[in-house]
Amino acid sequence: MREYKAIFICILICNVFVCPKSFGQTDYTYEKGKSFKNTNALSMTDTIDLTSISSPIPYKKSIPGQTQTIACPVRLLGYVRGIFFSRDSRPGDFEWPNNTNRLLPWVFNDLKELTDTRYPGIPSNAAPSTLGDALLLELTNGEYLFAKAIAGRNSLSWLQVNDNGSVTLYVSTLGKDYLKPEVPLLLIRQGKDIYSTIRQAYQALMKNTEAADLKSRTAKEYFEAFRYLGWCTWEHYHDDINESKVINDMKTIEASGIPIRYVLIDDGHLAHKNRQLTDFIPDKQRFPSGWKKIMSYKKENKIKWIGLWYSLSGYWMGLSPENGFPQVVRQALYPHAGSLLPGTDSTRIRSFYRYYVSTLKEQGFDFLKVDNQAFTLPLYMGGHESIRQATDCNRSLEAETHRQNMGLMNCMAQNVINTDHTSYSNSTRVSIDYKKYDEDMAKSHLFQSYTNTLLLGQTVWPDHDMFHSCDTVCGTLMARSKAISGGPVYLSDAPRDFIKENIFPLIDEQGKLFRPEAPAVPMPESILTNPLWSGKAYRVAAPSGNGAMTLICYNLNVSPRHQQVQAIIKKRRLFSSEQF
């Protein structure tokens, strides 16, 4: 049996610290284009030394009073190569911690490559953000190291890659509050096997109720509808939907002979003003009958379930002051940075989400796709208890959808607060949106989806996004990845355009998906490579049951020099069942 050990971080806390410059409170109010790189912080003299031994979740103690943010230099072990997980970054755009669906795997041999303008990166995305949430290293001794940022009760850590390739760990309240004297720093694990190293790190995280509210994927129920084929309005209509379009498409779906069992109504139905939600009823001009007519098309053996899209904070920019909520709900809201938000205490936040979920359930919906989750923290930033309140939003949504037996798809939920608080839900998007006819983006999508599943797949089934079966460029590519993902599979073609050859291999006669025992992940030789530029085949695998596995060898290279690659498969034992 292989032995695995936790990396320990021995942090000797002194009463001496270095403040690089005198500064007042930092304004952490979030704005598009605002970066928190090299943010004002109290520089701690003690290095986080990854060569020493301690617990998988070390704490920093004796933090001086009236400190918003600390910065801790990190001493890395010798490494051969690795992956830094962060969003992409472009001037004037959203930045960390609004990771949306854009937590991307940036592969390197030396961390300073990520700060080089010549870094080849990932096609269809901008340059790597040097502020990120996780780090995976292959060490010179042949072992693997996994480190991940975590949240405390009102603190959040993140990793910053500096121009010289060094790493600094920051911990902050991201608001007007000061850090407690003791805060968790990060999650860390070292081991001989890359899969077990990551899995054991998450097992340690699940035991720490201050840093997370998590259960493993295998310990949670999987919502019944997601075991079947679905259809979503988004990629076909985007937000240009209305009552007649949805009803006509449901009729066409039923007549198509394809057993689609649920419909997901995406963005475009909400009542809002300036992208702030005004009520949990649909736009009256687009949906004059509310949801009653659409719900009448549910049938036990046809379209059995209907789901609805909303944002965690209401709509893209939160809740409107000009709303139609009952007075008791209004009392659970407060103004901050131009929006109304649930809060300020946990009881009020929970009462808002109780109303949120119950209102939509009463209207006939079976599950929710809750989007824009990573932007909830930015909406609270710059205020008091920003992290605690944003975390309470995720906790409350989880608790209420579970209590009211509503299914939940998580989307744009790739910051630490979102990923580490899926106590009941069992599906999260692992990638940027799929785009029709865009082969390079499809390749990037697959690379991100499979690599992120190494992390997120510990606690949820990965959602690889919807796809068009009629996509003549990427349709078959997408169909295969959905099949092996184990997560929800939902089409977004105009129903008249369905291509049965890309659909029927995924399902039985009742529309039930053929699913693997665990989600597909990259095989060992493919994990720490960038398959878009490697010149090699990219291999992923998932256990299929009875000791068998499903394997796909991709050519994801985008260079014309590698239009063909060779892959050799030999019959041998590739994985133990525990590795999945």
Name every feature range the model reports, one short phrase each.
Residues D239-N242, K273, T419, S492-A494, ...:
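Short helix/loop capping segments that flank catalytic or ligand/cofactor-binding pockets
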Residues K482-S485, Y490, T529-Q579:
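Carbohydrate-binding surface patches
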Residues E224-I387:
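Aromatic-lined carbohydrate-binding/catalytic grooves of carbohydrate-active enzymes
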